């Protein structure tokens, strides 16, 4: 109460900071007449002036006011748009490396130009990050008009570009692209063998659009470059046949934690089935030799009992395609990890694709923390302000709207069953449609959007495709006639290709759009419809400019009339029904948002609400809930149901009370807090791998930068031999205690030389230092002979290539070991040990082991390496890019050919390991010993 009173008197911290920008806003406005008087040439010349001032020692803050004034004028001349004062404040927030929360329709894309231009003047590059290729391309093409007018270059990074195209885009002053593409380019760059092949520059300044989606929703999503493993499709299919035979009593499901576990009876039943199939070793399912079987059983159980077709995934063209839980979009190419996707393919009787091995990975949390300065924009960040600051050190500033918000947010209506809820939604749609008010219904999944669509069809509504001109003609004709069309469109993962068009036309009078969550985010819904979208569709293929202009003018007139109709679609509600002359209230027209259930996160609900009431337009929002909804069922529906019964609620009646909204908000806050804790805890683990990744990647770049790595290779060789001598000839030991034969055998195994160490050991008075010196000298002579044979230039190339290839190979193996360690480390908690500290300690030991193996493997390969003619080399294998989500186990694969893998010679010489190329761990060793590779040369390579 005291805090609320203080805020009334002094204003909130947010208000005070916004006021702090006013002086600079006034200064920019004061410059406007002077800047407006400049010719185009003089305005363009200001860019060179600003660069000169920076070179003379001025800072970006020193030139902010004139630079912002310049961008505002350039936008007026190129786009016909002038930055509002609140947009100038947004630009300052972005420049300072914080998050600007700006409501839908407030022009975030235009705001970015201010901070982008100012920071691009340094010449070090600015990255603008969006959530998909469509938005990256749209925003880059749109805003590049401003940048090119002012003499700056703009590049776009989208899927499908080759390396030279990417290098050109990154070399530009400003680069637009998606979060996935920026992250994958970073990983691919750190798998290359020449500096000139790398595409990215330094990570200096990035502005992230829809920052909450990228840095919160997808924060735990690792980007992964991977290669294929052995095919185990039949094993997945076999395990899958057992799961349908289990009954509900055989397993327990925890919906909150999203886990499923076998009961004692279920375990016994499954063990019996596995034993009969010959798949169970030992007595119990949980014996050590059955680890792989347990893993496959657990994934098959999850696939059958936790994942629902048409909600979590759909089956299309013989593939299991994941549905994004946040947007409802279909994610082609994305795959669940750890064998879960293969389990789903087996469940749906689709071809089971092989699993992949991780070659390189990074999370968005760690990728975006590499930037020297990071800013973000979104319509909904305030609810996650603590997380943004805690993890990214980003403050969230709520930017005031240019015009007051005229949207009515009504209290939720809660029904006892989903059937009653859908009936109420249908009745509300019919009322809104009768007065020509456009309606957007938000659903949580494809499954629920299609349930609602079927419900509408049963009551005489017809589904159309808003992206189909003929379908739209019917809607426009009905709108012109002022008659309800009873037509509706569904925007979900199945129809995502045209989502921008469908969303843009959701503001046409009488339009009914059903959308999963925030599909189509990034596209404004304009009342009356979108002139740009309609004009582009209507004039496609028409060459005659006069005819085009005539069509566009007709569309303009349509939209003006349509907007008036939508604004007039108010609803008069009687507060005292049946009473003559009773009180009434008017509810606004504009876009009507209906939420069909609450999401776990308040932010997602706020995003849906934010679709209505853009730029001061009127609008309405209302959520319809039932006790069957996921959030209600998991958090306290039993209590609510008892209360509804006590109130004597009849079928079809709803309870409407602000208390319900507050109770739901508290439930959502609990979920948000839990998810934040999960993300924060996972980041602590990921930071361990991230610190090691930075060391490895920096080492790679240093190696690529060095013209001559002979000194590094020699140090490795000498350190390795020192270790071998210390192992077999302990310090202060008598010569008769030396393990000379063991030293000789290990030298032969590791470096491939049979040296007379036994003869040396018999010499009178020889010490361990002398033994070490002779060994190092002989090995150095061997390498010097190779260098003389090939020439110093070839030798330098071979040394660098082997160093990089060995580092990459060991790093990949290290990633697998870290992943396995992370999966089991939680069990240490049962022994009263801190799993995180245990993970840090053991991960460090593994890293030290990697460095040790690096010395051994590099030395071994260089001692044996032979030059192979280029024409004997096979084509390079392809790699794939993946994106995992620890929330759901998703593995998002953006099919990418990399061609960065080291090439193996075509023929294997048993005496020359350098010719063996990649050898499977379970293959027979190419040396001819008859043992498996992992038990022979694979122990150290």
From Swiss-Prot:
<dbReference type="InterPro" id="IPR011130">
    <property type="entry name" value="SecA_preprotein_X-link_dom"/>
</dbReference>
<keyword id="KW-1278">Translocase</keyword>
<dbReference type="InterPro" id="IPR036670">
    <property type="entry name" value="SecA_X-link_sf"/>
</dbReference>
<comment type="function">
    <text>Part of the Sec protein translocase complex. Interacts with the SecYEG preprotein conducting channel. Has a central role in coupling the hydrolysis of ATP to the transfer of proteins into and across the cell membrane, serving both as a receptor for the preprotein-SecB complex and as an ATP-driven molecular motor driving the stepwise translocation of polypeptide chains across the membrane.</text>
</comment>
<feature type="binding site">
    <location>
        <position position="87"/>
    </location>
    <ligand>
        <name>ATP</name>
    </ligand>
</feature>
<dbReference type="InterPro" id="IPR004027">
    <property type="entry name" value="SEC_C_motif"/>
</dbReference>
<protein>
    <recommendedName>
        <fullName>Protein translocase subunit SecA</fullName>
        <ecNumber>7.4.2.8</ecNumber>
    </recommendedName>
</protein>
<feature type="binding site">
    <location>
        <begin position="105"/>
        <end position="109"/>
    </location>
    <ligand>
        <name>ATP</name>
    </ligand>
</feature>
<dbReference type="InterPro" id="IPR014001">
    <property type="entry name" value="Helicase_ATP-bd"/>
</dbReference>
<keyword id="KW-0813">Transport</keyword>
<dbReference type="GO" id="GO:0006605">
    <property type="term" value="P:protein targeting"/>
</dbReference>
<keyword id="KW-0653">Protein transport</keyword>
<dbReference type="GO" id="GO:0017038">
    <property type="term" value="P:protein import"/>
</dbReference>
<feature type="region of interest" description="Disordered">
    <location>
        <begin position="871"/>
        <end position="919"/>
    </location>
</feature>
<dbReference type="InterPro" id="IPR014018">
    <property type="entry name" value="SecA_motor_DEAD"/>
</dbReference>
<dbReference type="InterPro" id="IPR000185">
    <property type="entry name" value="SecA"/>
</dbReference>
<dbReference type="Pfam" id="PF21090">
    <property type="entry name" value="P-loop_SecA"/>
</dbReference>
<dbReference type="GO" id="GO:0065002">
    <property type="term" value="P:intracellular protein transmembrane transport"/>
</dbReference>
<keyword id="KW-0963">Cytoplasm</keyword>
<keyword id="KW-1003">Cell membrane</keyword>
<comment type="subunit">
    <text>Monomer and homodimer. Part of the essential Sec protein translocation apparatus which comprises SecA, SecYEG and auxiliary proteins SecDF-YajC and YidC.</text>
</comment>
<dbReference type="GO" id="GO:0031522">
    <property type="term" value="C:cell envelope Sec protein transport complex"/>
</dbReference>
<dbReference type="InterPro" id="IPR011115">
    <property type="entry name" value="SecA_DEAD"/>
</dbReference>
<dbReference type="InterPro" id="IPR027417">
    <property type="entry name" value="P-loop_NTPase"/>
</dbReference>
<dbReference type="GO" id="GO:0005886">
    <property type="term" value="C:plasma membrane"/>
</dbReference>
<feature type="binding site">
    <location>
        <position position="936"/>
    </location>
    <ligand>
        <name>Zn(2+)</name>
    </ligand>
</feature>
<keyword id="KW-0997">Cell inner membrane</keyword>
<dbReference type="Pfam" id="PF07516">
    <property type="entry name" value="SecA_SW"/>
</dbReference>
<dbReference type="Pfam" id="PF02810">
    <property type="entry name" value="SEC-C"/>
</dbReference>
<dbReference type="InterPro" id="IPR020937">
    <property type="entry name" value="SecA_CS"/>
</dbReference>
<dbReference type="InterPro" id="IPR011116">
    <property type="entry name" value="SecA_Wing/Scaffold"/>
</dbReference>
<feature type="binding site">
    <location>
        <position position="524"/>
    </location>
    <ligand>
        <name>ATP</name>
    </ligand>
</feature>
<keyword id="KW-0811">Translocation</keyword>
<dbReference type="Pfam" id="PF07517">
    <property type="entry name" value="SecA_DEAD"/>
</dbReference>
<comment type="similarity">
    <text>Belongs to the SecA family.</text>
</comment>
<feature type="binding site">
    <location>
        <position position="927"/>
    </location>
    <ligand>
        <name>Zn(2+)</name>
    </ligand>
</feature>
<keyword id="KW-0472">Membrane</keyword>
<keyword id="KW-0547">Nucleotide-binding</keyword>
<feature type="binding site">
    <location>
        <position position="925"/>
    </location>
    <ligand>
        <name>Zn(2+)</name>
    </ligand>
</feature>
<keyword id="KW-0862">Zinc</keyword>
<keyword id="KW-0479">Metal-binding</keyword>
<dbReference type="GO" id="GO:0008564">
    <property type="term" value="F:protein-exporting ATPase activity"/>
</dbReference>
């Amino acid at each position: 109460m005291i805090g609320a009173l203080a805020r009334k008197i002094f204003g909130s911290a947010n208000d005070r900071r916004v006021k702090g920008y006013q002086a600079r806003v006034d200064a920019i406005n004061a410059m406007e007449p002077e800047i407006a008087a400049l010719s185009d040439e003089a305005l363009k010349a200001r860019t060179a002036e600003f660069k000169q001032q920076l070179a003379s020692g001025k800072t970006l803050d020193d030139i902010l006011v004139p630079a912002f004034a310049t961008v505002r004028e350039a936008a007026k001349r190129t786009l016909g748009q002038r930055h509002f004062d609140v947009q100038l404040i947004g630009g300052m927030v972005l420049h300072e490396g914080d998050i600007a929360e700006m409501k839908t329709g407030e022009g975030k894309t235009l705001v970015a130009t201010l901070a982008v231009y100012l920071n691009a003047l340094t010449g070090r590059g600015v990255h603008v990050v969006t959530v998909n290729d469509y938005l990256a391309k749209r925003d880059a093409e749109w805003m590049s008009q401003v940048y090119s007018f002012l003499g700056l270059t703009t590049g776009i990074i989208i899927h499908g570009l080759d390396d030279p195209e990417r290098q050109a885009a990154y070399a530009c002053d400003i680069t637009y692209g998606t979060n996935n593409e920026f992250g994958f380019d970073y990983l691919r760059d750190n798998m290359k063998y020449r500096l000139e092949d790398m595409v990215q520059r330094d990570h200096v300044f990035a502005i992230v659009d829809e920052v909450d989606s990228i840095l919160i929703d997808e924060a735990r999503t690792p980007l992964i470059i991977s290669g294929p493993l052995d095919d185990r499709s039949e094993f997945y299919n076999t395990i899958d046949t057992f799961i349908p035979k289990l009954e509900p009593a055989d397993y327990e499901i925890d919906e909150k934690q999203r886990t499923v576990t076998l009961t004692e009876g279920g375990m016994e039943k499954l063990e019996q089935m596995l034993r009969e199939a010959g798949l169970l070793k030992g007595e119990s399912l949980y014996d050590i030799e059955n680890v792989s079987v347990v893993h496959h059983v657990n994934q098959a159980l999850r696939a059958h009992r936790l994942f629902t077709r048409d909600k979590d995934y759909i089956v299309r063209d013989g593939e299991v395609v994941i549905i994004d839980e946040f947007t409802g979009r279909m994610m082609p190419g994305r795959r669940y990890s750890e064998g879960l996707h293969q389990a789903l393919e087996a469940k749906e009787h689709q071809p089971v694709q092989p699993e992949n091995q991780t070659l390189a990975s990074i999370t968005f949390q760690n990728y975006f923390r590499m930037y020297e300065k990071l800013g973000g924009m979104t319509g909904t960040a305030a609810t996650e302000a603590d997380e943004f600051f805690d993890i990214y050190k980003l403050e969230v500033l709520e930017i005031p709207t240019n015009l007051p918000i005229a949207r009515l947010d009504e209290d939720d209506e809660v029904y006892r069953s989903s059937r009653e809820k859908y009936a109420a939604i249908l009745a509300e749609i019919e009322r809104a449609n009768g007065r020509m008010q456009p309606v957007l219904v938000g659903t949580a999944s494809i499954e629920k959007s299609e349930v609602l669509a079927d419900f509408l069809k049963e009551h005489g509504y017809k589904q159309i495709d808003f992206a189909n001109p003929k379908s739209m003609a019917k809607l426009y004709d009905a709108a012109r006639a002022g008659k309800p069309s009873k037509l509706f469109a569904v925007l979900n993962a199945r129809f995502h290709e045209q989502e921008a068009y469908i969303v843009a036309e959701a503001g046409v009078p009488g339009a009914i759009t059903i959308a999963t969550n925030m599909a189509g985010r990034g596209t404004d819904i304009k009342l009356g419809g979108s002139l740009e979208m309609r004009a582009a569709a209507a004039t496609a293929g028409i060459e005659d400019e006069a005819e085009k202009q005539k069509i566009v003018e007709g569309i303009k007139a349509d939209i003006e009339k349509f907007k008036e109709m939508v604004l007039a679609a108010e609803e008069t509600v009687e507060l005292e029904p049946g009473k003559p002359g009773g009180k009434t209230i008017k509810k606004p027209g504009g876009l009507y948002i209906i939420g069909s259930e609450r999401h776990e996160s308040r932010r997602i609900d706020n995003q849906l609400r934010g679709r209505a009431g853009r730029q001061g337009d009127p609008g309405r929002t209302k959520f319809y809930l039932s006790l069957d909804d996921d959030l209600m069922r998991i958090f306290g529906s039993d209590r609510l149901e008892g209360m509804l019964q006590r109130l004597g609620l009849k079928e079809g009646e709803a309870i409407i009370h602000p208390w319900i909204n507050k109770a739901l908000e508290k439930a959502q806050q609990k979920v948000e807090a839990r998810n934040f804790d999960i993300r924060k805890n996972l980041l602590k683990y990921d930071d361990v791998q991230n610190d090691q990744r930075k060391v490895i990647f920096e080492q790679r770049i240093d190696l690529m930068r060095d013209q001559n790595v002979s000194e590094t290779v020699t140090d490795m060789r000498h350190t390795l031999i020192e270790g071998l001598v210390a192992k077999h000839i302990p310090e202060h030991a008598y010569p008769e205690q030396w393990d000379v034969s063991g030293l000789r055998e290990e030298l032969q195994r590791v470096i491939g030389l049979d040296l007379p160490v036994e003869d040396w050991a018999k010499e009178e008075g020889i010490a361990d230092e002398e033994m070490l010196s002779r060994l190092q000298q002989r090995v150095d002579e061997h390498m010097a002979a190779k260098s003389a044979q090939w020439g110093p230039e070839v030798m330098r190339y071979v040394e660098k290539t082997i160093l990089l290839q060995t580092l990459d190979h060991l790093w990949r193996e290290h990633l697998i070991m870290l992943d396995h360690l992370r999966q089991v480390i939680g069990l240490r908690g049962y022994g009263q040990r801190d799993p995180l500290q245990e993970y840090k300690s053991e991960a460090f030991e593994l890293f030290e082991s990697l460095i040790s193996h690096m010395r051994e493997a590099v030395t071994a390969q260089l001692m044996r390496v032979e030059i192979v003619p280029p024409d004997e080399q096979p084509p390079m294998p392809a790699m794939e890019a993946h994106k995992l989500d620890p929330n759901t186990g998703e593995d998002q694969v953006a099919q990418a050919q990399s061609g960065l893998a080291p090439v193996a010679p075509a023929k294997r010489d048993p005496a020359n390991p350098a010719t063996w190329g990649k050898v499977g761990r379970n293959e027979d060793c190419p040396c001819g010993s008859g043992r498996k590779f992992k038990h022979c040369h694979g122990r150290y390579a």
